[in-house]
Structure formats: C-alpha cells, structure tokens
Amino acid sequence: MDSAPQQQPPVEFETDPSRYRHWQVSFDGPIARLKMAVDPAGGLRPGYELKLNSYDLGVDIELADVVRRLRFEHPEVRVVVLSSGTDNVFCAGANIHMLGMSTHAWKVNFCKFTNETRCEMEDATAFSDQIYIAAANGTCAGGGYELALACKEIYLQDDGNSAVSLPEVPLLGVLPGTGGLTRLVDKRKVRRDRADVFSTTAEGMRGKRAKDWNLVDGVFARSKFEQEVMKRAQAIAAAPIKLLPGERRGVTLGPITPELAAHARLYRHVELSWDREARTAQILVRGPSAADVAVVTAGDEAIHAAGDQLWALRAFRELDDALLQLRTNHLDIGLVLLRTEGDPAQVLAHDAALAASREHWFVNEVLRHMARVLRRLDLTSRSFFALGDVVGNGMPAFAGCLLELALAADRFYLLDEPAVQVGLSALNEGALPMSHGLSRLAARLYGEPDKFEALVGQRGLMDAEAADDAGLVTVRLDGIDWADDTRMAIEERSSLSPDALTGMEANLRFVGHENETSKIFARLTAWQNWIFIRPNATGPEGALSLYGKPQRPHFDWNRV
Amino acid sequence: MVSTTVDLNSKIPNNVGLSDDVKLKRALESWLPSYLEWWNDMGPSDFADKPVFLRTAVSVDSDGWAHYEHVKMPDYRWGIFLNPREGESTIRCGDEVGKPAWHEVPGEHRNALRRIIVTQADTEPASVEQQRLLGHTAPSLYDMRNLFQVNVEEGRHLWAMVYLLHKYFGRDGRDEAEELLQRRSGDPDKPRILGAFNQPCDHWLSFFAFTMFTDRDGKYQLAALSHSGFDPLSRTTEFMLTEEAHHLFVGETGMDRIIKRSAELEKLDPDGDIRRAGGIDFDLIQRTINYWFTYSLDLFGGEISSNAADFFATGLKGRYREDRYEEHKAMGATYRLPVVENGHLGERDVPLRNAMNEVLRDSYVTDCERALRKWNRTLEESGSPTRLTLPSRRFHRHQGIYADHCFDPQGNLLDRSRFEANQRNWLLTPADNEYLLSIMKPVYEPGKFANWIAPPNKGIEGRPVEFEYVRLND
C-alpha cells in the first residue's frame, strides 16, 4: 500500500474544461462562479473516496487549470466566487484516507502543488484584478478553510451549524499544511493567541465569533447567503479601478501535447530527458527564433494575436509541465541539468520588446506566468546545475529571461569560449520575482551589493570572463577542462544524500528576508514534512495512520 | 427577553444539588427565561391555559418519577435527574474498559462529548416544534394529553442535556445551550442538525409514525449513551429512557389503533373502501411507515464511521445493552455489510468498531420488526388480509453508503428513473397529506374518538378512557 502511488500510471498535469470532473465554472459578465463539486469516485488513485468535497492531487490539478484559464481566457472577469456544489459542506479539505495511504514523497508533492495553486489564486487577485471570494455555504474544514484563506474575502453561512475550522492538530496530529497557519496570522492578522485556540479546537468556530476573530469577513443567514454574497461580488465588480489597457479578448490555452519518447518528453521549445542510471535529467530550453522576436517587436496587438503560440507563453508552459513531471513522476532523479540553446542577442531583443509592452493585460499575464513557472523551479526539491556549453550546433542562450534559469540554479557552469555570451534584460530586474520578492539577480548577489548595482541597467552581451567578474558564474571552465570537471561535479553531486541536499538547497536559494509566501514554503512546509515522518503522525500508532481505523492513536509524549 | 428571578430549587425538581451549586444555578437562571420564551413561541400552540393531566418527574424514587396531576403546560416543572448509582461507575467499553468512569469531562474527549450531547439535545426541542400545531386536530382528549405529555417530556430532555452543557462544558457549553433555542425545525436559516427533525409532522398519522420510529431512534441513542464512560451522561440518559418508553408506547399503540380502525372500516364498507368510510387506507399507512422508518434510519449515522469507532474506542458510547455482551473492546472483529460496488450489490467486511452505527441500527430494526408483527396480528385478528411490512434499510436513504443509490422497498438496486416513477406508490405524497388533513377534525368530547382511529384499551394511570384528560373548559 505504501508505494501504491508510484506503481500507478504517471500523473499528467494538462487538462481542460471539457475534462473537469470536480469543478463547475460559469460566467456572468465580470463575475465567475466556481463551484467545487468533487466526484467521490473520481480519485486520481484507487483506494479512497473523495467524500464531502475532499480533494486529492487530481482535484487540485483541475483547480490550478481553472485559475490559470480564468486569467488568460476570461480577462473580463473581475470577481471569482468560490463556493460548493454540495449542500452544507463547502470543502472538507485534503482527503485523509488518501494522505494516510500515500508515501511521504506523494504527500510532500501534493502539499507543494496545492500550496502553489493557492498562491496562484492570490497572485491573480493581486496582479490580474481577479478577486477571489470564498462563499462558504457549509462547513469549511482544514484544507477547505485553507482554500478559503487563499481568497481575498471569506463569507460563511450562518445556520447555527456551519463552521470554519483547522482540525489537523487535534484530530490528525499534523499541521494545516496548505498555508493555513501562516495566512491566519500573517494575512488575516488573527491574534496569535486566538489562532492558537482556533487551531486546536477541532469543531472550529461559526457565526458571530468567527467574524469577531476575523476568521471570516462576514456571516449571512442561509436564506440570504447567495444573495448577499452576490451583492458583495457585484460591488467589487463595479468598483472603479484602473485596468491594464488592451482589448479584453481572452486567449485560449490550447494543449501543449509533448511527444513522448522512451526517456524524454519533447515539446516544441523544451526537451526533458532523463538518465535513470545516472539519476540525472536535463531540461533544454530553446530561445526565441527571429520570427518569434518579430512578433513581439510588432507591438501589443501582434503579441495579443499570437495568443498561446507566443514563444514566452508556450515555452514557459512547457517548462512548467516538465518541472511537474520531474517532481511527481521521476522521484529518483536528483540532479537536473539546465541547458539553453539559441541566440542570446535574440533573447535580449525579445525581452526588450516584451518589457515595452508590459502594460498590455495579456503581456502582463505572460510575464506573471513566466514568474510563476520560475518560482516553481525555485521550489523544486532537486539540485539544478545550469550548464552553459555548446549544445549540438547551437550556442547557449543564457540571457534575459533564460538567464533566470541559471540564476535559479544552484550552480552555473559556463564555458569560456568567445562565442559563449550571457546578458541581462529588463526582465532580470524584478519582473520575475522569487516567492520572497527578490529578483534572482538580487538574491544571487545579496552579499555583493556593489556588483549588483553595477549590473542594474546593464544591457547587451558579455563574454564568460566578464560574466564571471560580474558575479554571475559559479565556475568558468575552458574547453579543455569542461568535460572532466562537469562530469565529476555531476557525479559527486549525485552521490550526496538527497534529503540533505533538499534541505541545503531550500536554505541557500532563498537569501534575505522572508514574506508570507516564503514562510508557507519554508517554515510551514518544513515543519509539516518533519511531522509527516514522525511516528506520532505516520507511525503504526500515529494519528494520521489510524484516522478512520478502529484503533486509537498513541503518542510518544517526549518533546524533541 | 423576560426577566425572572425564581427560587429555582422549588421550581426545578432535581437530584443534582442545584441549590448548592452556584455556578450551575447562575447558568440555568439566565437560560430559563430564554427557554420559556422558546416554549411560548414554539411549544404547543394555543393550549397554554388548559390544565392537562400530566406526569411529572419530581424525584427518582419509584413513586416520584411519575407524579400525575392536572397542570398547565407552562407551569410544568421541568426537572433534572440522574439515575442513582451504587458503587463506583466504570468505563463500559473500548480501550479503557473497566477503568473508573469520568465524573468530569476529560479534556481529551471534550470535542467528541460536546458533539454527542449537542446532537442529542438538538432533537429534543426539534420534535416539540414539529408537533406544535397538532393539538388543533387531536382525535380525542386522550390523544391530546399524550401529545402534550410527549412535548413536555421532550422539553425536560432538553433540560437534561442543557444541564450537562451548563455543568460540565463551561462557557462553550452555555453558548451551545443558547444555540439549542435558536435553531428551529425546518427553518431555512437555522435548521435543526438532523434531517428527520426538519421534516414536517403536520397530522396525526405522521405524529404516531414519528413517535413510533423517530423517537425509537432516540431510545437506542440514549441506551447506547447510558453505557457512556462519562458518568453524568450515562446517568442522565438512563433516567430519560424511563420517560422515552411512554413516547414509544404512544407511537406504537397509536399506529395499532389506526390499523385496527381501518380494518373495521374495511369490513363496514360494502366494497371494502376504507377511504369512502372516512378512514386511512392501508397503502397510505404503508407509505407512512416507509417514509418515517427510513428517515429515522438516517439518524443512526454512516454505516462505516470513524466517529462511531472513536466514540466506542474511547468509551463514550456503547452498544444497545452493552452489559449483555461478553467482550467490550470489539477490536479485530469485523461486520459484514452489504455495499454497492461497480453498480452491483455485494458485501464487504468492515472493522466492527467502524460499524457501530450499523450495530445499533440492527437493534433498532429488530425492535421495529417486532412492532410490525404486533400490528399484523391486529390485522389478523380483525380478519383483514392485509399485512404491513418494513422496507429495506437501503430504501430511501439520505445519509450513509446507500444515499447515492436508488433501491426499491425490498432493497433491490434500481436506476433513478424507475425509483422516481414509483416514488408515489412508496412514499407519502402531497395528496396523501391533503387527504389526511381533510379527515383530521378535532374531537374534544371526553371519551369520544375520531372516526379514523380506535379507542385505546384502557386509560391513563387507572383513569377511564372517558376521563377529561385535558380540561378545555376551565
């Protein structure tokens, strides 16, 4: 049972509305209704039923797709009302039986993905003027309340019974791991002593007290609930704001269907390949062609018209899919080599044109999407080495938005050869921030502010030596040393403890201050992942293992 | 809000030392006006000033728990009683069986106990609300009195549960006690917690079916809780059971008297047309049984339940007559349950602890089958060829593993369209209710009974059937 998820067919992350099993989306002008109606028989894996609107990875893959499509395909939407299609239950959170029977890795990947989805909802609220409001027309427990917490406003039905709750600690011996604890005190500013009471009170809170403690923004009687929530939605939709310009015509996200080979997934701009024996994989991203650059330099309308075929959108959707594939379906791959191919000058030209159009709503969406994909990379628990060497006939193209791959990587090896060049664009200077808000350039040069200052505003290409001097390169190697040195580095890295590396990389990548999002992925997730392997949660007598079973849990009372 | 200061101890008969318990006294003092306000708003409509021949529990002694006199309902003395105990109570089931029972709420089990008590408590005022208009269509003074007896005792059962909330659950308990008076049966905004307690019960056939089937769920819940390791809950529910027996008597004999009368009318009418003779035909009675029995089955909770397993494992709730079982841990054993898998009915073994709701439901179904046999004996003795049946426990369910599937009353799987096509033959319809309301005219003359129901075999507490059980002319 323990390894069941891995023996199953690989998980695919691409979906579209025609395939949804768990969500209903409808539109009325600027208001979208998003109803969670989880099909109990629609679990991604056998062995559990998704009762009471509880969710698994499959449910969340659809939600992530909904959130993304709302931004690209429905730019007219200003408010997204999230409610339940099941009477009296908003959402019961992650399916406990699914968690109980999952491997550690599955749990961790599941939590990470759901966290990213909730951050996407907040990102849409902050940067796409799509405000999520949770209409909790029933009990809102655990991950269900955490889903509501990801919305800007939360309304709860006041029927003497419906409550919001975080019962994970008292009932399951784990944490509300989808940002619940963090959003409670950091986002909603619930007093921390009250948050302590709330998070240990299994039955949660309802009605007036939920409102008084700021656990929700309002409570409405059952018979008026729908009406009051919609009134609020209409008020938000009608509030005057300065929308980004550009015709609000949606861009359909077509499938990116990769070609599947024995040890590779081949996309149009991206190739993911893996070597199980060596426990390494490679992601190769090809830079924009001259034709791709011509599209962006033609201006807003041409970019909008290119739609989902725009290089910057297509390539990063492909990269996103490749990362998710690695995370979920290739657990034994420890080291990922990031390579780029193309003309770095074209990348810079591309970036300059895209940055010039960034006020257009669609370009804004493209840039926000690129940023999210890069954050997914930052948060992927694999070692990343960026390798700037010659690929086949092509030159590496670590410039602008593709230089972000090198800056996200744990190390950047660059071949010292005259034809190999790197360069910065406007996109390296804050347009694609990490989850804690810093640009990757600022994070890379956190301890060398002078070098950082010197690079800001610098455009054009530099050779390997200049890049090394500027602090962009970890190891610069000439053609004689390259093969041996990189081979040894790769083999050495692959021999180290994967757990220690995961922890080390997560610490080193995020220099500087924390924010709410980074706390969710660092503090909350790290503690949760520790608790997940502790006997008190997942041992034979642990609370999570025994949930729903006839035995009662027994704890080891020693504090660690 | 009415403001009252009363000498609680003389007003509230009790054996819980109320006069010496300042904290409890204070809590009840502030709750009492809200309770009376609720009773006036939601209790029996219009008969507040009529003396009713009521049984009042004034003590737990054998001569004190059933004290009869004519009382106006608002003056009824709602008391608080715990069954006395000899010796030390112990935990009766689960992992801790045999250890001393709890006399305070253990923090570890606070949430579970609160949930158990609030859910039980919520049903008590709910049934009063559901039945509040029935006095206006009572088929006799005898029946009217029984209705009011049931109502005041359901009120007392609310007191019994509120006592536990006030005494043992601190501020949260007081809040919950207040909420119990805020929820209303069938209210779209603040419904009662459980489904059957939000169904309308607007004529006497439903009243009798309700007291027969739904109150019988109450009996089994109380019986299971009377084996709780939380001693005050165990002792409270034990005492409630003595009163509950009367409610079941009202339901079971009420149905029996209707069946008896229908059999008589069947013979009286030349074509055997009971309706033409102003009675209630057997198909309609069968539909009523199907309706209320199945709604009541839902009250036992899911067939496979982690809560049920927890409640048993922790010793908070036992089985029916737990003391008659030899083994009280129920670990390792399984229960074979019919389940729907891939569109077919099969069987599955589930851990016994997780099946405790179903185990309790088994005891309940056996009891209902006994009553059905009794009614069928009445039919047999009356010479009627009709026999009534209990539907399958899979039929017409809204909770549990059968809720998402359709079954016929025999328990065979059906597709939804066939279920819907037959629904009016199986379950109460609006036309049924219209007909029943049309024949339910009040009969207020002592000793007289409505045409659709037979008189009882005997009166109450040695009084004749003609006794003026409710003094409407006072």
What role is predicted for each listed range?
Chain A
Residues 141-196, 393, 399-454:
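CoA-thioester-processing core
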Residues 1-61, 65-78, 84-92, 98, ...:
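C-terminal alpha-helix plus adjacent terminal tail
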Residues 93, 98-105, 109, 113-131, ...:
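Hydrophobic, small-residue-rich alpha-helical packing segments that form membrane-like cores
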Residues 125, 372-375, 442:
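Proline/glycine-anchored alpha-helix kink/cap motifs
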Residues 80-81, 133:
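Conserved hydrophobic packing residues within short motifs/helices of P-loop NTPase cores
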